[in-house]
A protein has these predicted regions:
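Structural signature of hydrophobic alpha-helical transmembrane segments
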Residues: 31-44, 83-96, 167-179, 219-230
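Long hydrophobic alpha-helical segments that form multi-pass transmembrane helix bundles
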Residues: 118-179
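Membrane-helix interface "capping/anchor" motifs
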Residues: 34-39, 55-67, 85-90, 106-117, ...
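Alpha-helical transmembrane segments in multi-pass membrane proteins
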Residues: 30, 41-49, 53, 57, ...
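N-terminal signal-anchor module of multipass membrane proteins
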Residues: 1-58, 170-177, 183-193, 212, ...
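Short, non-helical or kinked segments that cap or interrupt transmembrane helices
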Residues: 59-74, 115-117, 198-199, 203, ...
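Hydrophobic alpha-helical bundle architecture
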Residues: 217-226, 234-249
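Generic transmembrane alpha-helix signature in multi-pass membrane proteins
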Residues: 26-32, 64, 74-82, 185-189, ...
Length: 305
């Protein structure tokens, strides 16, 4: 594969914080299996970032490692799902994909003194902005119930729990898909890039589901994978991608990640319920930043990515 084809797929693999073209290819196949619209959106987001990243102060190394493209890929996916079809919505999606890159650069520079990576912060910010601004524009509509008249958090423990589906949906929901086969393929894709990432993913997912079930999480939410996908990202970030920059003991960092991420998701979901916007990957961001700050040495290595 040429360098640009490698980059195209790395833009997708970097969503799970792994730099591997074959991982990106297998993930893309998983997306098409789960929902063709998501597969197509991921491709469009990756292509647009390929064509425009050089205009937003990215180095060739950053572009070809996929660091410029993973937020555009995520934004293309979620806005394709959240916005109702119209030419105005298409324009908003395209603008948002491009905006992800300068916003990512701004956040990266803002975080440099703290030696923290921007992660998926641009994705979260832009999605929230678009969902909230849709209330002020007649021709930009969303299927998300923004600013509901009432906010009610209902926990149902009587629904049948489907552990296998929930387990792999925890993984597939990274890309906003609830699909067992897609989740299996994404796990395999992670193993291709890093055996450690694959093993950590499986163990953390199992422990996370046990913890969430023990605490009495809503069974429907567990089945859909909404409680677990942030943990999948956090465990790869802390246990693999930024492992060398974190001076916490590996076992302690692992346990803290497994415990903190579901707690952060539950708190964030409740906090945002009255506003009506999804928590997205915000729990992953908060957990990862917290543990990276907790594990920083005094040598000031630059881990910003």
């Amino acid at each position: 594969m040429s360098k640009w084809i490698h980059t195209f797929f790395k833009n997708i693999s970097q969503v799970v914080l792994l730099e591997n073209a074959w991982t990106g290819l297998l993930i893309l196949i998983a997306l098409w299996i789960g929902n063709w619209k998501i597969g197509l959106a991921a491709m469009i987001g990756s292509v647009i970032s390929l064509l425009t990243a050089r205009f937003f102060n990215y180095t060739d190394e950053e572009i070809h490692s996929g660091l410029a493209g993973f937020n555009p890929v995520l934004i293309a996916i979620d806005l394709t799902l959240f916005l109702l079809w119209s030419w105005q919505s298409i324009l908003v999606i395209l603008i948002s994909i491009v905006l992800a890159m300068p916003i990512a650069q701004a956040i990266k520079n803002l975080l440099k003194p703290f030696r923290l990576p921007e992660l998926t912060t641009p994705f979260v910010i832009i999605t929230w902005v678009v969902l909230l601004m849709s209330q002020q524009f007649k021709f930009v509509k969303t299927n998300v119930d923004v600013l509901p008249l009432t906010a009610d958090v209902h926990v149902n423990l009587n629904t049948t729990f489907h552990p296998i589906h929930a387990f792999f949906s925890d993984v597939s929901q990274i890309f906003l898909i609830e699909h067992t086969i897609s989740g299996i393929l994404i796990v395999i894709a992670c193993f291709i890039a890093s055996r450690r990432a694959g093993i950590y993913l499986l163990i953390a997912n199992f422990l996370g589901l046990l913890l969430e079930f023990f605490f009495g999480a809503d069974i429907g939410t567990l089945n859909e994978g909404l409680f677990g996908f942030n943990l999948m990202l956090s465990i790869i970030a802390i246990g693999v991608t930024f492992r060398s920059a974190n001076h916490l003991k590996a076992a302690i960092a692992f346990i803290l990640t497994v415990v903190m991420t579901p707690m952060m998701y539950a708190a964030t979901a409740t906090f945002l319920e009255p506003i009506g916007i999804p928590s997205l990957t915000f729990p992953f961001i908060i957990t990862t930043w917290t543990l990276l700050l907790a594990g920083q040495s005094t040598a000031h290595p630059d881990i910003a990515k």
